[in-house]
């Protein structure tokens, strides 16, 4: 089992991760990230929007099993995070989340 918080930290430190709903949406429209992570309590409108663009781009979505506050804490940020996009996983194995939950 992958430790989501640890792998997210490794991805942030060694790869490229964009944080926030708008930034994630921009990444989907322009750069095709490798994985999208959504907080379990993301509002329906936001989830629908991200899921639509992710489906068009063929990008897998992982629903983080916690709130936006917990996702922010997992990313070592002092704020809520509703969505984030992994552009480059770096040395992490975070992309295996998409395989496990496909």
Swiss-Prot record:
PROSITE patterns registered for this protein in UniProt: RIBOSOMAL_L30E_2
Keyword set, alphabetical order: Ribonucleoprotein, Ribosomal protein
Pfam family, one: Ribosomal_L7Ae
Gene Ontology BP term (one): translation
InterPro entries: Ribosomal_eL30, Ribosomal_eL30-like, Ribosomal_eL30-like_sf, Ribosomal_eL30_CS, Ribosomal_eL8/eL30/eS12/Gad45
GO cellular-component term (any): cytosolic large ribosomal subunit
GO molecular function ontology, one term from the record: RNA binding
SUPFAM superfamilies: L30e-like
UniProt-listed PANTHER family: RIBOSOMAL PROTEIN L30
UniProt similarity note: Belongs to the eukaryotic ribosomal protein eL30 family.
Protein name (record): Large ribosomal subunit protein eL30
Organism field: Pyrobaculum aerophilum (strain ATCC 51768 / DSM 7523 / JCM 9630 / CIP 104966 / NBRC 100827 / IM2)
Primary gene name: rpl30e
